[in-house]
């Protein structure tokens, strides 16, 4: 069931979104050669709790850490640990914060030091595909209109869109209805309504869209070992343009 938020609930979503966006910025600022993914996660966790929120990937999603940190061919759900980042890596950080019963969810992929032109282009295209998609995150459009726009843009650069993992509603639940695929034909699915809150999150691969899950039961990687990038924000559907609840100028 799609949950339409009340105005007071929207205000709480805004506060959760600001904290979540701040945590993502903390992570971005730490991405550099020699840093471990565990160190990044520790600072993300600290920022969330000091902001009066809780790390909802742990409390709601059962994930072992506050942040998912995925490197190179890892798409999502990378588990932070002793892995050391190296020059040329691309690092996807997905974070979530729960504030007074409501969740924010956002992600971004960041270059570690000097990266290849191909890697930087992938990051740029993935980010822009999000903005292409949310042009249709407006009252009256259908859910598939978002994913169709994401797919058209990313595929125009020769990339593929992950199909087994999708965007979603977000609110009191970390993952709510509806599911929001990053591909498909336009004109399908529920119509968007004012005060829906959703997370749109393109996951874009240089190679094919097929994926596999590592033995840890969490980390999803590209089946062909190609690079992958991820960009996500939580949104509020309004009477006009969508409001990005997890917006940050630097990401």
Regions found by a protein language model. Give the residues of each.
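Active-site neighborhoods and metal-handling regions in enzymes and metal-associated proteins
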Residues: 1-251
């Amino acid at each position: 069931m799609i949950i339409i938020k009340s105005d007071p609930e929207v205000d709480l979503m805004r506060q959760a979104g600001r904290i979540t966006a701040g945590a993502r910025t903390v992570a971005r600022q730490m991405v550099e050669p020699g840093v471990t993914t565990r160190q990044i996660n520790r600072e993300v966790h600290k920022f969330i709790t000091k902001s009066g929120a809780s790390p909802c990937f742990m409390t709601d999603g059962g994930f072992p850490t506050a942040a998912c940190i995925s490197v190179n061919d890892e798409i999502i759900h990378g588990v932070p640990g002793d892995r050391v980042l190296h020059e040329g890596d691309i690092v996807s950080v997905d974070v979530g914060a729960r504030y007074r019963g409501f969740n924010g969810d956002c992600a971004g992929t960041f270059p570690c030091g000097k990266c290849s032109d191909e890697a930087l282009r992938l990051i740029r295209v993935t980010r822009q595909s999000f903005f292409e998609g949310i042009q249709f995150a407006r009252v009256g459009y259908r859910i598939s209109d978002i994913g169709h726009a994401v797919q058209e843009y990313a595929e125009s650069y020769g990339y593929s869109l992950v199909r087994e993992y999708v965007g979603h509603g977000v609110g009191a639940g970390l993952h709510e209805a509806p599911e929001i695929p990053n591909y498909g034909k336009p004109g399908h699915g529920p119509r968007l309504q004012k005060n829906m809150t959703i997370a749109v999150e393109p996951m874009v691969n240089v190679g094919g869209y097929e994926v596999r899950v590592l033995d840890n039961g969490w980390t999803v990687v590209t089946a062909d070992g190609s690079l992958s990038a991820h960009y996500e924000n939580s949104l509020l559907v309004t009477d006009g343009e969508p409001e990005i609840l997890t917006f940050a100028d630097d990401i």
